[in-house]
Amino acid sequence: MAIGLIGRKVGMTRIFNEDGASVPVTVIEIAANRVTQVRTLDTDGYRALQVTTGTKKANRITKPEAGHFAKAGVEAGRGLWEMRLADGEGEGIEVGAELNVDIFADIAKVDVTGQSKGKGFQGGIKRWNFATQDATHGNSLAHRANGSIGQNQTPGRVFKGKKMSGHMGAERVTTQNLEVIRVDAERNLLLVKGAVPGATNGDLIIKPAVKA
């Protein structure tokens, strides 16, 4: 696993490349990620970096959090995230260090993880892209009904995992192999081609693409 960073979705825009083609991009703000803890095989049984970013009001910080941030010698952030490390990764990174967007300067593609927009309770047509039933020809009540959900007396039940109506969205989603269009180290911005999960101002985890 490669070292990733925590960012914030600013929104979408478009830029023009050298050929004059319009490229849709998502702007991700990646403020300095401050290392709050370095987990090791000896003490924790696995290797990882724990980071925070952003700020948090003093009256919103619990005493355990305050002690944890004080021990690391970093400003309290809006949350804590961990990045697993493979052997040989993260060597030399110590508690209190800052990781910035420039680590993506030589990266061509990234994977972006976020929480998708919540859609509430939705039917099968919106949630699973089911086809609608007949608009006419005797159909009066079942235009958007799911249809059959099983077989017969055997098996006599609905299988687990059957696609049906239910809560849609608000779940962890990863979009893979997004092309890095631009890295703006001065303004802490990363521009990637296409859309990323979640709403504006949502937290994102950006890592070098595993399938690149």
UniProtKB/Swiss-Prot annotation:
Q: Spell out the protein name for this chain.
A: Large ribosomal subunit protein uL3
Q: Which positions bear N5-methylglutamine?
A: Q153
Q: Which GO terms describe its cellular component?
A: cytosolic large ribosomal subunit
Processing after translation: Methylated by PrmB.
NCBIfam families, alphabetized:
L3_bact
Quaternary structure, per UniProt, is:
Part of the 50S ribosomal subunit. Forms a cluster with proteins L14 and L19.
InterPro entries attached to this UniProt entry: Ribosomal_uL3, Ribosomal_uL3_bac/org-type, Ribosomal_uL3_CS, Transl_B-barrel_sf
User: What UniProt keywords apply to this chain's record, in alphabetical order?
Assistant: Methylation, Ribonucleoprotein, Ribosomal protein, RNA-binding, rRNA-binding
Q: Which PROSITE patterns match?
A: RIBOSOMAL_L3
> Which species is listed as the source?
Shewanella pealeana (strain ATCC 700345 / ANG-SQ1)
Which family does the similarity line name? Answer: Belongs to the universal ribosomal protein uL3 family.
Q: What does this protein do?
A: One of the primary rRNA binding proteins, it binds directly near the 3'-end of the 23S rRNA, where it nucleates assembly of the 50S subunit.
GO molecular function term, any single one:
structural constituent of ribosome
Q: Per the UniProt entry, what is one GO biological process?
A: translation
PANTHER family given in the database record: 50S RIBOSOMAL PROTEIN L3 (PTHR11229), LARGE RIBOSOMAL SUBUNIT PROTEIN UL3C (PTHR11229:SF16)
A Pfam match is: Ribosomal_L3
